[in-house]
Amino acid sequence: MNHTSDTALLIVNLGTPEAPTAAAVRRYLGEFLSDRRVVSIPPLFWKPLLHMVILPIRGPRSASKYAKVWLQEGSPLSVYTRRIAEGLTQHLPDWRVAWAMRYGAPALTKALDALQAQQVRRIVILPLYPQYSTTTTASVQDVVEAWCKRTPQVQVECIQDYAEDPAWVAAVAASIRRHWQAHGRSEKLMFSFHGLPQRVANNGDPYPQRCQVSASLIAAALNLNESEWVLGYQSRFGAERWLQPYAEPTLWALAESGIRRFDLVCPGFSVDCLETLEEVALGFSETLAARGATMRYIPCLNDDPAHVQALAGLAQRALP
C-alpha cells in the first residue's frame, strides 16, 4: 500500500460485541438499539424499556448465541470485515484502506479521524450493506455527514448500495454454483434477507425493492425459473408486522407441501455473523429437520476474492 496516498477507502459494517459475554452484548445492543434510525419509539418511553427490561434479558440470551459462532480470532463479523479490508489493499495499492463499525469498535468517527490525521483528502465510504435502507446505510451516512461538517477540507463520497452491481451479483451466483458442485443441488433455493418493520417500508424505504432486485438478478445469473427459488425475510424483532414473507415459516410451509431439500443464501449480508450462522445455519436447519426436511446454508461471500474485487471496483468508480 502506498502510505503517502491522499485517497482512502473506509468500509463500514454494522457492528458486533467485543466478546461473547452478557456485559459486552449489553454494551453493544445498548448503542445499536439507541439509534433512532433503528428504533423510532420516543426516547422518553424507549430508554427505560431498553435499559430496564430488554438489555437485562437479551444480554445473557444473545451472549450464549454469540458463543456458538465465535471464532478463535473473534467475532465472525469483525474477522471477515478485517480480512476484506486486508484484501482490498491488494486491489487498491495506491489507496489507504480502513474498516470500521457503525456500532461498537472500531468506531466509525475514530476511523475517520485517523484517516484525516494521515493527511487523507478524499475518502470513499462503502457501507457493507448491498441493499440500501434508511435503517442501515442512512445511519452510516448520518455519522459521516456530521463528521464532514467539522472536517470540510476532506472530500467524502458515500456509496449508496450495490444491490445490482454486476460484479457483486456474479460473485454471489458463483458462490452458489460452487456449493452445488460440491454438495449437489436442492429442490428449492431461498434468498433470505434481514427484515425490517413494514411501517418503515410504508414510509418510503426502498429496501424491499432492492432485495427483490438482488434476488431476481442472482436467480437470472443461475438460470433459475420462478418455481426454483423463493425470497424471505428473517430476524424479526418485536410484535409489529415486518416485511413478509417471513423466511422460516415459508420454509416450514414448503416442507409441509412436500419439498424436502433446501439451499439457503443470505445476499443481504456481506459477511457471516450471528444472524446467518446461529439464527439461519443452525436454527432454521434444526426446525426444518423436525419437519422431515434438510437445509444447507451457503456462506456469505466474506473475504472471497471475487467479493473483494467487486468492492474494489465500486470504490474506484465512486470517485469523480
Curated annotation (Swiss-Prot):
UniProt GO molecular function: ferrochelatase activity; metal ion binding
Name of this protein: Ferrochelatase
Family of this protein: Belongs to the ferrochelatase family.
Top EC category: lyase
Annotated source species: Xylella fastidiosa (strain Temecula1 / ATCC 700964)
Metal-binding among keywords: yes
Keyword Transcription: no
Keywords: Cytoplasm, Heme biosynthesis, Iron, Lyase, Metal-binding, Porphyrin biosynthesis
GO cellular component terms, A-Z: cytoplasm
Subcellular location(s) of the protein: Cytoplasm
NCBIfam families per record: hemH
BP GO annotations: heme biosynthetic process
